[in-house]
Regions:
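Conserved beta-strand elements of the Class I
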Residues: 4, 31-32, 149
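NAD(P)H dinucleotide-binding glycine-rich loop of Rossmann-like/cofactor-binding domains
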Residues: 90-152
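Glycine-rich beta-strand-centered segment in the early N-terminal region that forms part
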Residues: 22-39, 52-95
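Short, well-ordered loop/turn sites that connect or cap secondary structure elements
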Residues: 82-83, 142, 226
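Local beta-strand N-terminus motif with an aromatic residue
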Residues: 85, 101, 145, 189, ...
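Glycine-rich cofactor phosphate-binding loops and adjacent beta1-alpha1 units
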Residues: 173, 187, 191-226
Length: 226
């Protein structure tokens, strides 16, 4: 089968190749997914550049990307919660990374059935970003009536964090650019801050949680608005 592989660390244009590789071998608790859509995330860029070698040592060549949606075409002997033909999506574990391929083997505990009202492409865009948003807010102890500042509300993680925070009953501030103000409001944010024309530090004074995926000065400035 064909798969996109990271063949060396460095600039993206020099580091990737579509290669012919063996179809994955299933373990007892795995399912084999025929890939219909896959997604890339910022972490994939940093892996390619070699910035994460100390934290994520990966033998090369290696498959790339974690998000996938598709159809189950085979399953292991110990898989009882899925059937051949199920439409599914997943954020695959580190050791099974490599979703930009014709097929990917995934442990069944990391797989969910795809909602019928979204496309394969939409489903593939959700898992890693969605889990990042959900797990971060849960770790922060989000609860109803919390005031939450979510930076970069129009990003993949931020847009999902807004929706999850609202579902938990929080009041949501978010920052975004002028072009995305209307869309972010439609996601449910209570106060949208256009960072090109407004300074969020003059608006947010009493946040219970600051959700920051940007880093740099935003991390240190968070203490000014809590």
């Amino acid at each position: 089968m064909k798969a996109l592989q990271l063949v060396k660390y460095g600039e993206i244009k020099d580091s990737l190749a579509f290669n012919e590789v063996s179809k994955p071998t299933l373990q007892a608790k795995d399912v084999l997914i025929e890939v219909k859509a896959a997604a890339i995330n910022p972490i994939d860029k940093y892996i390619i550049l070699g910035n994460l070698q100390g934290m994520l040592p990966i033998p090369l060549p290696s498959g790339l990307a974690y998000d996938v949606s598709g159809i189950i075409v085979e399953k292991g002997d110990e898989v009882s919660n899925f059937e051949i033909g199920d439409l599914v999506y997943s954020r695959v574990p580190q050791e099974q990374m490599g979703t930009i391929a014709e097929y990917v083997a995934v442990t069944s505990v990391a797989v969910s059935k795809k909602p019928g009202n979204i496309s394969f492409e939409e489903a593939a865009s959700i898992p890693l970003a969605g889990l990042t948003a959900l797990q971060s807010l849960e770790y922060a102890g989000i609860k109803a009536y919390d005031k939450v500042l979510i930076h970069a509300g129009s990003g993949g993680v931020g847009s999902l964090a807004i929706q999850y925070a609202k579902a938990r009953g929080a009041y949501v501030y978010t920052t975004t650019s002028t072009n995305n103000v209307k869309w972010v409001k439609e996601l449910g944010a209570d106060r949208v801050i256009d960072y090109k024309t407004e300074d969020y530090k003059t608006i947010v004074k009493d946040a219970d949680i600051v959700f920051d995926t940007l880093g740099g000065n935003y991390s240190s400035e968070a203490f000014q608005v809590i």
